[in-house]
Amino acid sequence: MAWTKYQLFLAGLMLVTGSINTLSAKWADNFEAEGCGGSQEHSFKHPFVQAVGMFLGEFSCLAAFYLLKCRARRQSDSSVEPRQPFNALLFLPPALCDMTGTSIMYVALNMTSASSFQMLRGAVIIFTGLFSVAFLDRRLVPSQWLGILITIAGLVVVGLADLLSKHDSQHKLSEVITGDLLIIMAQIIIAIQMVLEEKFVYKHNIHPLQAVGIEGFFGFVILSLLLVPMYYIPTASFSGNPRGVLEDALDAFCQVGRQPLIALALLGNISSIAFFNFSGISVTKELSATTRMVLDTLRTVVIWAFTLALGWEVFHPLQILGFLILLMGTALYNGLHRPLLACLSRRWRHPTQEGEQERLLGDSRTPINETS
């Protein structure tokens, strides 16, 4: 069935905004500007400030939800309303996981390439699958276990590509290894978030935009408050800011003031996450979860192509192999092979049936020709 213009628009919006989200965050990391107190130019390494911005973007999804709710009320549509009342504090545990995992990933993005960052996020299906078996009493079919094993192999290949790639002064080998490991660690926390959401939240049939918005609210408020103690926690050279603390929000604002393009990158990150969540949810509703997974895979290709074109990273052939293996593992885990196998079996069956019909017709025609 052909896609409608609206469905094409949603797919394009998801692909574009999802790519902008990662690329804008990496773009901000690449800027250098003076900080507070006349400090020398230094890189914009403020992962927790960026995470606060991302949660602000998620929080804005509540505005989109209430607009949909108002329109639904005018049309007497009750699909937006939850089936039963719920306590908003249900979202606090998954929001804490989201906050922790996102913050770790922004730290990791400072240490590794954007394409590796996007590819290694595929590790989430490994831990989601294992945790769903352990805590949700779910049984994985053999193809899903095979998908997990193939995904592990793909992660190893992507990691090897990072190890063997040429590294500049910005991304040393030790930083790249640490960054890759942090991304894997973050996926464990994100998988816990998904299991918590499925076990305690989704049974209330809450609209996804409302769920994202509430989690964004908790993440924004809590992480904003945590920026205060982070300003005083020493971390030596790990943080990358002049004061050597876990996060220097004041330095971030000073750098933004001296380099307006950083503000543009942050604005792109904040707005893109809101539109990405909206379009992703809409694609799942209008098309399918499989389509959303395919578009997310294409997003990795777009990010990779842009980072290579902009010279942000060096091409390594192993990354192609690793990406293809990850793609195969993700497709198997999500059941994308089933419609493909069904299509192939139909194509295989039809020529065989046609051949059998021809033989039957041929056999039936021969006696007639002979008698005539």
Swiss-Prot record:
Residues spanning the membrane? 48-68, 89-109, 116-136, 145-165, 176-196, 211-231, 261-281, 293-312, 320-336
> Which residues are modified by glycosylation?
110
Q: Which residues carry this modification: Phosphothreonine?
A: 366
List the keywords (alphabetical): Glycoprotein, Lysosome, Membrane, Mitochondrion, Phosphoprotein, Signal, Transmembrane, Transmembrane helix, Transport
UniProt-annotated location(s): Mitochondrion; Lysosome membrane
Q: Where is the signal peptide?
A: 1-18
Q: Which Pfam families match?
A: SLC35F (PF06027)
Q: What does this protein do?
A: Involved in the maintenance of mitochondrial membrane potential in pancreatic ductal adenocarcinoma (PDAC) cells. Promotes pancreatic ductal adenocarcinoma (PDAC) cell growth. May play a role as a nucleotide-sugar transporter.
Q: Protein name, please?
A: Solute carrier family 35 member F6
The scientific name of the source species is Rattus norvegicus
